[in-house]
A protein has these predicted regions:
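Long, hydrophobic, amphipathic alpha-helical segments used as structural scaffolds
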Residues: 51-54, 111-116, 204
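C-terminal or late-domain output modules
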Residues: 1-28, 38-41, 62, 78-79, ...
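Non-catalytic architectural context of zinc metalloproteases
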Residues: 1-31, 59-65, 159-176, 181-183, ...
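Low-complexity, serine/threonine/proline-enriched polar segments
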Residues: 122, 126-167
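Short, conserved micro-motifs enriched in small and acidic residues
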Residues: 91-95, 99, 187, 191
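Catalytic Zn2+-binding segment of zinc metalloproteases
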Residues: 97, 103-123
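Pan-zinc metallopeptidase signature
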Residues: 154-231
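Auxiliary, metal-adjacent structural segments of Zn-dependent hydrolase domains
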Residues: 12-80, 84-94, 118, 136-149
Length: 231
């Protein structure tokens, strides 16, 4: 990624800023119907300024690592790397803003890991939900070893099983009331990031209903960061 960024320095790279402090570097343009200023407006209207202090910047381009992993965004090395969505149908400013919010959550987790997880409450809520889902799937005829769901070394295998063996569409029908989305099942990091995304740019009331402990943690952190208790 760094080499790709360096090679673009002499080209027509565009720069924007969030809250006049966090740079957005556009190495490859979004599709014509996407308005970068509208994305910035969404982010500035709904995401607290302090959250952008967790990153050094946002890079938008055609990054091989994103393509290889079949993902649209990634938090890495204190920055967010985002696809330019040149081949994506149905993409909107709202979708892109949510992708950024999701990666901001990973940046927040990187900086505030102790504050988020020290009391094990989120972990217990997350694991309790996975136990319920495992019971539902076994009742439905799936033979699933428990270690697939609860081993930190098998996160990729679990993701592959959920996506290919069961399918996200089917999981969406099984998991209402348990998880915000099938993607949040795979790891506690994704459970947390999906929660932050919903808290900031979705429906906080839905998060509070589905994941009350996660919601309360975010509400507490939000208040502490705004008041300066953690700065």
């Amino acid at each position: 990624m760094k080499e790709y960024i360096k090679s673009s320095v002499s080209k027509n790279r565009k720069e924007y800023y969030l809250f006049n402090q966090t740079p957005i570097f556009i190495l490859n343009e979004f599709p014509p119907h996407i308005n970068i200023n509208q994305i910035i407006q969404i982010l500035e209207n709904y995401i607290p300024k302090f959250m952008f202090s967790f990153i050094e910047g946002i890079y938008i381009g055609e990054f091989e690592e994103l393509k290889d992993r079949n993902i649209q965004a990634l938090f890495k090395d204190s920055a967010i790397y985002l696809s330019s969505f040149k081949d994506s149908e149905g993409v909107s400013e709202e979708i892109i803003a949510r992708d950024i919010a999701h990666e901001l959550a990973h940046a927040m987790e990187d900086k505030l890991s102790y504050e988020i997880y020290y009391d094990s409450k989120i972990e217990n809520e997350y694991n309790g939900k996975k136990k319920k889902l495992l019971s539902i799937l076994r009742y439905g005829g799936y033979k699933i070893p428990e270690e697939l769901f609860f081993s930190d070394e098998m996160v990729d295998e679990l993701d592959d099983f959920l996506y290919k063996k069961i399918g996200y569409d089917k999981l969406s029908l099984i998991t209402p009331g348990l998880f915000l989305s099938p993607y949040s099942i795979t790891s506690i990091r994704e459970y947390f990031a999906n929660g932050v995304e919903e808290y900031l740019l979705g429906e906080p009331a839905v998060l509070k209903d589905i994941s009350p402990i996660l919601y309360n943690k975010l509400d507490t952190l939000d208040g502490q960061l705004f008041s300066g208790e953690m700065t």
